[in-house]
A protein has these predicted regions:
Chain A
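Iron-sulfur cluster-binding electron-transfer modules in prokaryotic oxidoreductases
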Residues: 1-264
Length: 264, 484
């Protein structure tokens, strides 16, 4: 699971694959992720033709449909630049499942493998490739972290968010019970088995809230929608925030036009 | 004493049963506590993740190697068992297995069979068949005994009565065992069971057991247990019948050691069990104990279907430790009975379709978030999530050209889902169309329905943002140009 990281100088350019969830449901998080990268002096390229990694079809057993969608992404990243993805499960899809999906087509398989090698989850890229060193500029706060199952078991990046947060002096990270347990989202599972999914989401929301944190953080859009939607339905004011947004806010933004601080 | 025959489990049934358990806070708490306990016990046995990884790799290799030579190993096993004086029987399905065992019972005019724990005997509904033939089949494993007394099925492959509390058991014994009064003292309860069973061992005509590992090279059957009842069943009655699945064979005795070490640690967090029986034939001349006659029934029941496919074959690596259940967040919420299969939890989701066909089980591979906890703990590294995805595909599609269809192939196909995913593929493989869709979805977000099928049962509706990331980026580009 732990990967060999590219040797050599810091990349100057990266592609950003936003994922369909971030594009439509939490675009602010995508913007904050892009700005975190740009502040490190990186040019972020956003291929306009990107749509979705194809995961919903793939995990539901519709491999042909997943392949059609995945195929439409394969040519969007022609330069040999890293592809940064602000979501563990979509990164996992591209990194681990794309090569399998095209196993029977040598041309596409080669492309898929090349792409898979270049895919990084955002926190992994910030920490392991860019070696970011940050200074905290926010008020003391307590947070707790929900790491997605893909981050934990597919990407091996569940400790990275923790390490990034450890750089922030004013941020205390509280430990939730059953941390490694799934939040119950599971893509189409959440609508196919609503009772089980709802129970899992509810238990996860409890565990996060019981830490006494001011908010919880996650690097996965699906988990965030699931847990936040559950809390909102309960009329609970406790909420989760995308890790990228939290990191951007805490480290003062860029002071540029689109910094969160300025917009607020 | 009877147990109910296996319940058919169509999709709506699973959903209903799961919802029932989920709505019961008492059961939820009890399952959670039991699973937390087992998870902690296992974790304590594996303090060194690297060592565990090496052990799992070795165990996986052994299981893969054994399966790669399965036909030859089965022949070798049979030859050596016969040499040791064991009669070997082959059963393609549950009916055949039951008929074979019934035949042996009839030969001996048997009235009473004592049983050690055997999931394959549950799989073929042996108790039911014995009951129908007027033969008493008595479970002697404490958990199985409790479940049998209650007229239920096991809810876990290692801990069959894990769904029962101390109070449930106290009540059950007081009601069903003559002369026993209500007590919640666990030792006293166990003693009740022991007293009943002890006498039955002496009276039984037949002892039945499962098999954890069958060793081809020596013709030995290995039996892992904690209560000593397995040893009683396999030594006291005059006839011992062992029953197991055809995948349980390994080539050499030395292959058993690493598997055994992982099995007990993964299952109950024990470094070793109280009893480990290696049975190599019936009583020999001059020996003072042991059965005079011994049989092995090797059951297929869908295993060759899994075997025939390279990927699905991995299902047969399983050593039935139950760790995948203990770590499964879905099993933890709903317990074993909701699945309606002999094997619940993740292993049940991948093996039941071969045993019962996809028509009855197509919903099960979908009963998972694919969180991966099962695959992470599986001591023989079965990639359970990948197999779940594969079975989801087989359940909703015709067989691929050149592939033999699975039993019940395509039974879970619905027009709605097929169309939905066709639509998904159409939209998301056409960037221009998707951009138009995203444009509309954000502008017309007020039209988002407030009732979104299962999603909104426990969550607020999903609503697109007012501006997509593309919109935000486009605005930024305009801003930048303006400020130049
Ligand atoms: S699938 Fe793996 S974890 Fe589950 S019972 Fe079998 S061996 Fe154990």
């Amino acid at each position: 699971m732990q990967r060999n990281l590219p040797a050599g100088p810091r990349p100057k350019d990266v592609y950003f694959f936003a994922t369909c969830l971030v594009d439509l449901f939490c675009p602010e998080a995508g913007m904050d992720a892009i700005q975190l990268l740009e502040r490190e002096g990186i040019t972020v390229h956003f291929p306009e033709n990107q749509t979705c990694c194809g995961q919903p079809a793939y995990t539901s057993g519709y491999a042909d449909e997943a392949r059609a969608v995945a195929k439409a992404q394969l040519d969007l990243f022609p330069e040999n630049w890293p592809v940064v993805v602000p979501s563990g499960s979509c990164a996992g899809m591209m990194r681990h499942h794309y090569p399998k999906l095209f196993a029977e087509d040598p041309m596409l398989k080669a492309k898929a493998e090349n792409l898979a090698e270049r895919v990084f989850e955002l926190s992994e890229f910030l920490l392991k490739v860019l070696n970011v060193k940050w200074k905290d500029s926010g008020k003391p706060t307590k947070v707790t972290l929900h790491t997605s199952c893909s981050a934990r078991r597919e990407m091996g990046t569940h400790l990275h968010a923790r390490e990034l947060l450890a750089q922030l002096d004013g941020v205390e990270v509280l430990q939730q019970s059953h941390e490694s347990e799934c939040c119950g989202f599971g893509g189409t599972f959440s609508v196919r088995q609503p009772a089980i999914s709802g129970a899992m989401a509810s238990d996860k929301a409890d565990a996060l809230k019981e830490t006494g944190a001011d908010a919880f953080l996650s690097a996965d859009g699906g988990c965030l929608m699931n847990i936040n939607g559950t809390l909102e339905k309960r009329r609970d004011s406790f909420r989760g925030q995308h890790l990228a947004s939290f990191l951007w806010e805490r480290t003062g933004g860029s002071g540029g036009k689109n910094g969160k601080g300025e917009k607020a | 004493m009877t147990t109910q025959p296996m319940q058919f489990v169509p999709g709506s049934e699973f959903k209903r049963r799961a919802a029932e358990v989920v709505a019961n806070p008492f059961l939820r708490k009890s399952f959670r506590g039991a699973m937390d306990f087992l998870i902690a016990k296992r974790a304590a046995q594996f303090p060194d993740p690297e060592l565990l990884e090496r052990q799992r790799t070795l165990a996986e290799e052994i299981r893969r190697y054994s399966l790669s030579r399965l036909p030859a190993l089965l022949e070798q096993l049979e030859a050596n068992l016969v040499k040791n004086g064991v009669k070997v029987h082959w059963a393609e399905n549950p009916d055949e297995a039951n008929a074979i065992i019934l035949g042996i019972c009839r030969q001996h005019d048997a009235r009473l069979m004592v049983k050690g724990k055997s999931m394959v005997s549950e799989e073929v509904e042996l108790n039911h068949a014995m009951d129908a033939a007027g033969i008493e089949a008595l479970e002697s494993d404490m958990g199985e005994y409790i479940v049998q007394l209650a007229g239920e099925k096991p809810s876990h492959i290692i801990m069959p009565a894990i769904h029962k509390t101390k109070q449930d058991i106290a009540k059950l014994f007081a009601e069903k065992v003559p002369g026993v009064s209500y007590t919640e003292d666990v030792d006293a309860l166990i003693q009740v069971g022991r007293d009943v069973l002890r006498k039955k061992f002496m009276d039984a005509d037949i002892g039945l057991s499962g098999v954890n590992f069958a060793v081809a090279e020596t013709g030995s059957l290995c039996l892992v247990e904690n209560e000593g009842n397995g040893r009683m069943c396999t030594t006291v009655p005059n006839v011992h019948i062992a029953i197991t699945g055809i995948e349980k064979v390994v080539e050499k005795l030395e292959h058993v050691v690493p598997l055994y070490g992982l099995l007990t640690r993964s299952a109950t967090g024990q470094a070793i069990t109280t009893y480990f029986n290696v049975i190599t034939g019936p009583r020999r001349e001059g020996e003072k104990d042991g059965p005079r006659e011994m049989h092995l029934v090797l059951v297929d029941n869908g295993r060759t279907q899994a075997y025939a496919d390279e990927q699905l074959r991995q299902t047969l690596q399983c050593i039935r430790c139950g760790a995948c259940m203990n770590h499964c967040p879905v099993y933890t919420r709903i317990g074993g009975h909701a699945y309606g299969t002999t094997y619940p939890g993740p292993i049940g989701e991948i093996i039941s379709p071969h045993m019962m066909g996809l028509a009855a089980t197509h919903v099960l591979p979908g009963a998972s978030t694919l969180c991966g906890a099962c695959g992470e703990v599986c001591p023989v590294k079965i990639p359970i999530p990948d197999l779940l995805i594969r079975l989801r595909e087989e359940a909703t599609h015709e067989a691929k050209p050149g592939h033999a269809p699975l039993v019940g192939q395509g039974a879970g196909k619905t027009t709605f889902a097929s169309l939905a995913f066709k639509g998904f593929a159409f939209l998301y493989s056409r960037p221009a169309l998707y951009r138009l869709f995203a444009w509309g979805a954000t502008r017309f977000r007020f039209l988002t329905p407030s009732n979104q099928a299962g999603w909104t049962a426990t969550r607020t509706p999903l609503k697109p943002a007012a501006k997509s990331l593309r919109d935000l980026l486009a605005e930024r580009r305009i801003d930048e140009r303006k400020s130049c």
